[in-house]
Amino acid sequence: MISRQSRVCSDAPSGGSEPSAGIGAVPETCTVLPTTTARENPATGSNGECPEIKRRSISGLVSRPVDALRQIDDWDVPFAVAGVSRPEGTVATRGDTQSAVRLASVSKPVTALAVLIAAEEGVLDLDEPAGPPGSTVRHLLAHASGLPFDGTVPIGQPGRRRIYSNEGFAILGQHLALRAEMPFDEYVRAAVCEPLALALDPAGHPGAGMHACLDDLLVLGRELLEPTLIAAETLAEMTAVQFPGLDGVLPDFGRFTPLDWGLGVELKSGKSPHWSGSRTSPQTFGHFGGSGTFLWVDPVARIACAALTTREFGEWAKTAWPRLSDAVLAEASRG
């Protein structure tokens, strides 16, 4: 059984920021910002001004995608922050990198990483039963369990269709807690947050309720480029197509044949249009969230890019995110 002990949970203050309904309190080092549906303030920084781009001098980088990040100044959102990282560290950021927002579905890769750590530790097996009859942990991670977006009554047979399911990740969280014999959020803190020194708060829905700041996501992106918490072979399995050939609907983007998915991460493969833009490689993986968040990792370009906003995903993001992503890669490729 897992030998890690959660220090984050025991050290958490009893007061501090008030949590959103159903969501645990966020560490005092983070300022939690609400998600909105429209522009409330032209600022992209929490102080009402646009923080300057922060550069990190990293040996060996041929180019730093700095100018590309200025695009977020033109986004019609109350708050925006974006950044780029490589395995060596963070390349550049623009905006307030320490204010936390709800990640929405960007929570799913965090949960997936915790589940994969548990699998390596022998806490659970990816192919053990979990969820509806015939489903396994692997099915739940890959949205192939037959469960609907919400609700516990299956609408398909496991392994037959790619049905995007928040409920599947709720069940994953329960299953991990049962097998680890500790609360889900405590396991994530001990297995993921503490080793990576993240302020990320894993309380709430395992597939939609976590809070984090940009600094956290950029560290997570580096971890998914060069893992330290899981073996390289496990990362390869995470980013390989699970149950190949399944058709499905990518939320807000439509039907794809096939709709490739890994273990808790969406795989770009041949999808077009795609929220990560046209310059990212087919090997790119990651997730976007309905609260206006995204993280993609391109193992070919060796770059991770993330953005957090407080405006719900919509048509604005379908244009803004690919444009930003393409500019980041274009600038990074220039020697």
Name each region found by the language model.
Residues L246-L250, G314-G335:
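Short, gly/Ser/Thr-rich active-site loops of penicillin-recognizing serine hydrolases
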Residues R102-V106, A118-P154, I163-Y164, L178-G207, ...:
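Active-site helix/loop module of the DD-peptidase/beta-lactamase fold
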Residues G60-L103, A114, A142, E266, ...:
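A short, well-structured edge-of-sheet supersecondary motif
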Residues H205-A208, A212-L214, A240-V300:
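Active-site Gly/Thr loop motif
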Residues G95-Q98, I155-P158, F169-A170, P202-P206:
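Flexible glycine/proline-enriched surface loops and loop-helix/loop-strand junctions
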Residues P109-L113, H143, G168-H175, A208-I230, ...:
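Active-site-proximal alpha-helical segments within enzyme catalytic domains
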Residues A68-L69, A82, E88, R102-D127, ...:
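Active-site SXXK
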Residues S3-S10, S14-S20, P27-C30, T35-P42, ...:
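Low-acidity, Ser/Thr- and Arg-rich intrinsically disordered low-complexity segments
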